[in-house]
Amino acid sequence: MKNLIVYFSWSNNTKNLVEDLNTEFKYDVVRVEREKPYSRDYNTCAYVEAKEEVEKHIHPAIKKLNVDFNSYDNTLLFFPIWWYTFPMPIGTFVEELKDYKGNIYVFANSYTNDPKYMENSMRDLRSINKNINFVEGLFNKSTKNHIDFIKKI
């Protein structure tokens, strides 16, 4: 099986998790980045930009990803929870995966430990692209838990 890691990270918490995991797996890694970067000021990013995108279902333009996604059996998708679901650049990424035939395993992390956020994310991802097989991965787990889970994919 050939696996790819795709992630979004603003504060680098998710980036650090992905880097820790990839010392074990050595998968190809792609970062989803908003075309116009979010403010580096937390309050502006969280309470203005990200909140507006979620409330208005805005999927912002993202930087081009030069990847043949169908050359991978599975995509491991990592992101933080923003406003009870995934960050909207992830929505853009999922929208743009027109003909992906593999599985997308979803991994989310959040400051709060409410499992409803993972449920929201899975529901919202599936509503954006009904042709993709989204598989619930882990929510707010340790690097070791992630490694053990990913080894079974």
Q: Regions from the language model: what does each represent?
A:
Residues P89-F93, N120-R123:
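Short alpha-helix in the alpha/beta-hydrolase fold that links the catalytic acid
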Residues L77-F78, V106:
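Redox-cofactor binding/interface segments in oxidoreductases and associated redox assembly factors
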Residues F69-N70, E95-N103, D114, N129:
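Short, conserved loop/helix-junction motifs that constitute active-site signature segments
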Residues V94-E95, R126, K151:
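Generic structural signal for well-ordered alpha-helical scaffold segments
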Residues M1-L77, Y84-M88, K130-N131, N145-I153:
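N-terminal beta1-alpha1-beta2 submodule of the flavodoxin-like/Rossmannoid cofactor-binding fold
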Residues Y105-S142:
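Short, glycine-/small-residue-rich phosphate/pyrophosphate-handling segment
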Residues W83-Y84, N113:
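Acidic catalytic loop of the alpha/beta-hydrolase fold
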Residues T14, T92, N109:
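Ser/Thr-centric signal marking residues that sit
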